[in-house]
């Protein structure tokens, strides 16, 4: 099976945005990855990278550097519904904005939808026990 060890995000401020995710989710920066245009933080099973705008040119993506709108979102799974609620409050204190307050989804998760300080979408989830019906998606 192919692995996906890194998920990277382009950011205007690698220091500020990586610190947001470190502070909220208690991740740790891997100092061996640090450069003037990159920060890498460890999650439980992968790394989360933050690329400065200069990385667009480095990757031959200069024409793509003026992105608008939401192009992806991150998911963070936690151990309890209380943890979802706690992390929502902490995220907002650190500069996030709530898009959708914690709620039960049709697929039987308890989740909240937020944007980080740069407007990137993320969800905080607790998968709940039990079955769900795909026919309930619009309820």
Enumerate the language-model features and the residues they cover.
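Conserved beta-strand-loop-alpha-helix junction that forms the acyl-donor binding cleft
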Residues: 11-14, 105-107
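Vicinal oxygen chelate
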Residues: 1-5, 28-81, 85-115, 126-139
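Conserved catalytic core of two-component sensor histidine kinases
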Residues: 8, 15, 85
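Residue-level signal for the nucleotide or nucleotide-sugar donor/cofactor binding architecture
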Residues: 9-12, 79
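Conserved active-site tyrosine of GNAT-family acetyltransferases
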Residues: 17-22, 91, 119
């Amino acid at each position: 099976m192919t692995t996906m060890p890194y998920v990277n995000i382009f950011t205007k401020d690698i220091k500020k945005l990586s610190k947001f995710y470190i502070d909220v989710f208690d991740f740790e920066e891997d100092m061996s990855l640090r450069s003037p245009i990159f920060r890498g933080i460890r999650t439980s099973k992968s790394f989360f990278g933050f690329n400065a705008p200069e990385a667009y040119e480095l990757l031959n993506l200069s024409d793509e550097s003026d992105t608008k709108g939401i192009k992806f979102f991150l998911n963070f799974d936690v151990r309890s519904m209380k943890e979802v609620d706690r992390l929502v409050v902490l995220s907002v204190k650190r500069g996030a904005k709530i898009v959708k307050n914690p709620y039960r989804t049709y697929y039987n998760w308890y989740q909240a939808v937020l944007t980080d300080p740069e407007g990137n979408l993320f969800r905080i989830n607790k998968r709940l026990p039990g079955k769900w019906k795909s026919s309930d998606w619009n309820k």
